[in-house]
């Protein structure tokens, strides 16, 4: 009887181990996705940035701007060939919380962003973001991204 009770107790104890390992792996993958988003921008790789999004992704920009839906619209919003490219020399992101439910993950974080456009360098010293990612055949991809910041704290200066 002791053997049966011990066996059942061990089975219950170790039954959660693979799930815990899977969750830790998913959390690491979501952190990597979050960092890859900043890295692709810093590298100036439009295709790399876009590869992180699902085809039906939505951006919900700051300051109440209208949502931007779909891969084509997002690419046009950020990488319109009629405009000079935005250069991102610095983007620090810190995932503060990560939630996972099945094939959906949510990252809430804080960020510092510096970008250069049309001769001006803009620094956002602090801001928030929420990234919702879904797991598909190609791994985790961004399905929805929103961010906010306080424009009164933006620092702007000419680019040398």
Name every feature range the model reports, one short phrase each:
Residues 16-55, 154-160:
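Short, low-complexity N-terminal intrinsically disordered segments enriched in polar/charged residues
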Residues 103-113:
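A short hydrophobic beta-strand element
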Residues 98-105, 133-139:
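A short, structured loop/turn motif at beta-sheet edges
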Residues 24-28, 46-100, 110, 123-124:
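A solvent-exposed, acidic/Ser-Thr-rich amphipathic alpha-helical stretch
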Residues 126-156:
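Short beta-strand edge/turn micro-motifs at domain boundaries
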Residues 1-5:
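Positively charged n-region of N-terminal signal peptides that target proteins for export
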Residues 6-15:
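Bacterial N-terminal signal peptides
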């Amino acid at each position: 009887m002791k053997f049966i009770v011990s066996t059942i107790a061990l089975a219950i104890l170790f039954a959660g181990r693979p799930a815990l390992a899977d969750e830790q792996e998913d959390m690491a993958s979501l952190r990597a996705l979050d960092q890859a988003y900043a890295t692709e921008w810093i590298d100036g790789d439009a295709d790399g940035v876009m590869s992180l999004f699902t085809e039906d992704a939505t951006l919900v920009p700051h300051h109440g701007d209208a949502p931007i839906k779909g891969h084509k619209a997002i690419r046009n919003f950020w990488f319109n060939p009629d405009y000079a490219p935005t250069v991102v020399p610095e983007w620090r992101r810190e995932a503060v919380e990560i939630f996972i439910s099945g094939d959906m993950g949510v990252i809430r974080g804080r960020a510092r962003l510096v970008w250069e456009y049309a001769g001006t360098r803009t620094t956002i010293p602090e801001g928030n973001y929420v990234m919702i990612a879904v797991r598909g055949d190609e791994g985790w991809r961004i399905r929805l991204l929103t961010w906010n910041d306080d424009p009164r704290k933006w620092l702007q200066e000419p680019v040398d």
